[in-house]
Amino acid sequence: MATNISTSPKEDVPKEKFHLDILNFSQTSQIQFGLRLQDYKKYRQYCSKRIQRLRSQLRKQYGKKNYVNKIVLNGGETEKQINDVRYLQISLLKTERAWSYAMDLKAQFEKDNDSRIGFHMNRRFGKASRNSTQLYELCKLVADQYTIIEAHAYSSWMASSLSLTKQDFKKALEEINISKTIYEKLSEQGDHSQKELYQKRIEETEPIIRFCLYNLKNEKNTSNKVSQNTLTIIEQSLEELKNQENKKKSSTSSTTTTTATTTIEWKSKSIKVDEKLDEKLKIFNEFKKENENKLPKNINASIDTTSNISPIFNIYDKLVYNLINCETIVKNDLSTLVRVNLKNKSVKSEIEEQSTRILLAYIMYHKMKYLYERNSILITMMQRVLDGEKVDESAIKKKVKKVTWNDLVRLSTHQVKVYTIMSESRDTDSNKEIARDQDAQLILLKSIRLYYIAVCLAKSLKFSETMAVLDRVLTNIQNVRKTNTKNQQILNDTNELESNIKKQRSQIHANSFIQQLSENQDLKNQMSSLSIGGITTASGKSNDLISGLDSFDTSFLTEKKLVQLPPQLQPVQAKPIFFDLAFNSVTFPSLDQRKKGSSTGTPSKGLFGFWGRG
């Protein structure tokens, strides 16, 4: 028994609109397949092969055996036929093939000036314009709003190319202005990579507009603006695009909690940061705000190294640690982009790679900045320890157990690398004054490193190598001054380094002379025979330095005596130390005989003896 099965009509499900990055697709194909070297023939051959490959994938091949009707714009039937985005790609590649053929013929026409080639060129430009218009109409039926707007700008661009070949400059100016206006509006809405792509396209429109205005200078009522009707149509399309994007954002926000993405401005470009990196950057910024006041504002100024300086090193280490986490994320993203570009490079992916590199430069600059400040403080402390000054040794002992000049060489080498990366990643590359200070500071850091190496060589008694290194440091100091830097701190450090080198050179000269005399016996004998005069011993050599001040004698190199102890006894005319005690023990001759002799003589006459009276 037959039963009638009633089939209910299917509900109309809204068909998903196709999306095609027209400008990115065309620009990528042009750069990869010939147009980087202006080889239009190679690009045309690529377009033909790509169209054939797409048709074979869609099983829409045209040939003698199987005849397939071409797609005709007929409303609903067209929507049923176009059930894949590859149909839009075929239409775009047909436009690109006709345009590349026309550009190849244009180059031949400019050389030969053959009218037949010029006629063929106009036909090809006309076909490219018709195919771009067909692409625009197809996008209206089956593509999303973003693709429709891009197709409109692309169609206007091809129409302006056709009008230029026909020397219809007024029509060409109108079409190129429409294309420029659309790309300007799209650059305001897209992300960084799309913005760069549209900006390049806008720059390409400028010479075309100037050429049209030059040829229309004698005509009246020529304006460089889009008509009001066209502008309203463009604005309506862009308003629809904004509404669609807002709907997508609202639908995603209902399911997931989204946070506002931050943008970083570096090297005159603004870059959006993804959520994963944004979290790490927020941690870094919060820690920086909390502890920035504890860091020294000027590392070159006098730092109190005697107090507890360990917390400052901990802050620097934490800042660098947070930036290393950010660096790891960006480097992973960059490696994936590079790997993708090796297989399938596009203009959009190249711009994304460039923006990722700029983002990496931003992170590397701040990381190297904090590393440079931290190492500068550590070098200052180590140098003060070697000079015998008091510092907070607890902070240094965490880094090294015992400070030596080799530690300063290692740190200064690291400082040169850090400052080189920091200067390469700096934001203001165009400022000549900053670039000049960077060059001077880098040469100064290399000079300081060489100075520490010279000190280590001097400690190893390699005096000739030390002198060679110090001569090179002096050459670098002259190069610092040739940069004409006006940074006072760099000039002060240069002068201080030069004074230290002069002191070191005088010590090395003396030590080198002593070493040569002690090692070379012939030279020592020759120098010992020289004498200008002075007090010498019986052997002809002075026994000590004090006794040979007026003579040139090298015997002190082996003896090294400042004064002879005990000294030789010599008669000295001086009062005895204990004269009174010595006087008590001295026996003098008796005076009794002299006393008796005086009593037996003539008696005295008295007061009146002068007149002869007794």
From Swiss-Prot:
MF terms (GO), sorted A to Z: 7S RNA binding; endoplasmic reticulum signal peptide binding; signal recognition particle binding
GO process annotations (BP): SRP-dependent cotranslational protein targeting to membrane
Keyword match ATP-binding: no
Localization terms from the record: Cytoplasm; Nucleus, Nucleolus; Endoplasmic reticulum
GO cellular component term, pick one: nucleolus
Pfam family, one: SRP68
Domain of life: Eukaryota
Alphabetic keyword roster: Cytoplasm, Endoplasmic reticulum, Nucleus, Ribonucleoprotein, RNA-binding, Signal recognition particle
Record note on quaternary structure: Heterodimer with srp72. Srp68-srp72 heterodimer formation is stabilized by the presence of 7SL RNA. Component of a signal recognition particle (SRP) complex that consists of a 7SL RNA molecule and six protein subunits: srp72, srp68, srp54, srp19, srp14 and srp9. Within the SRP complex, interacts (via C-terminus) with srp72 (via N-terminus).
Domains as described in the record: The N-terminus is required for RNA-binding.
Name this polypeptide is given: Signal recognition particle subunit SRP68
Lineage summary: Eukaryota, Amoebozoa, Evosea, Eumycetozoa, Dictyostelia
Name of the gene encoding the protein in the UniProt record: srp68
